[in-house]
Amino acid sequence: SQVFDAAIRQAEEALDLTSVSELSMALPAAYEALKAAVETYTEGLCAGWTPGEEVDLTWLLVNPDFSEGSKGWEGTSFTAASSGVAEFYDKTYDTYQVLERMPAGTYRFRAQGFYRYGDKAEAYDAHQDGSEQLLAGLYLNSSRQTFMSLFDGSAPYTYNPYTYPDDVRSADNAFNRDGEYRANEVEYELLAKGDLRVGLDKTEYRYHDWNCFDNFKLLYVAK
């Protein structure tokens, strides 16, 4: 579009400058122009759909599938971001991305993922006897939803023999080979144009607990 073309030209012209004083003025202006271009494009993309349709805005997220490790994610560092997934183990955390100048409306943030409430034996027992607590969650600004249990009844795995995911490699297989652990979604209504903070957190410590996840998606619900 013309807006993007103009912003890119402005950025290229800024990069051609050589003096520090010129660069210090031109680069911030070029960055603001690029952000404005993304804002205009996003607003146009979210308009003109049938009410209730989902518009995929995942392209606004940096590295939503962890194919580039932890790139793009702020806050608490992942325990690991390898084998195409990311994880937190035995810690509290708050990890997120902030999307600026988003159009007003309803958003949905989804992921494949699960939470294990401690060591696998005690977590399984807690799931079976109803004492399990799902401490890890997805959030969109002030809305939050917990991750599903590793031992959720929809998962086609067994405890004996143990075939549930037990490391990042087997979690990657569960997500990307088997297509499991998809029931993780949070919804938030942004009442006016503004920022969206999308992330995941856990504020309560639990010994040897585990949260593993992949394939984040951001969707706008057309109105």
Predicted feature locations:
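Beta-rich interaction/scaffold domains
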Residues: S1-L60
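Extracellular glycan-recognition surfaces and repeat-rich motifs
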Residues: V62-Y93
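Extra-cytoplasmic beta-strand recognition segments
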Residues: F66, Y93-Y124, N184-L190, F216
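Extended, low-complexity, turn-rich repeat/linker tracts enriched in Gly/Pro/Ser/Thr and Asp/Glu
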Residues: K71-G75, F88-D90, P103-A104, F114-E132, ...
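Extracellular ligand-binding interfaces
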Residues: Y115-N173
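Short beta-strand-plus-loop segments that form exposed binding edges in beta-rich domains
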Residues: D172-R177, G199-D209
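Noncatalytic modules at the cell exterior or secretory-pathway interfaces
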Residues: E187-K202
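Exposed low-complexity, polar/acidic, P/S/T/G-rich flexible segments that act as propeptides
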Residues: R206-K223
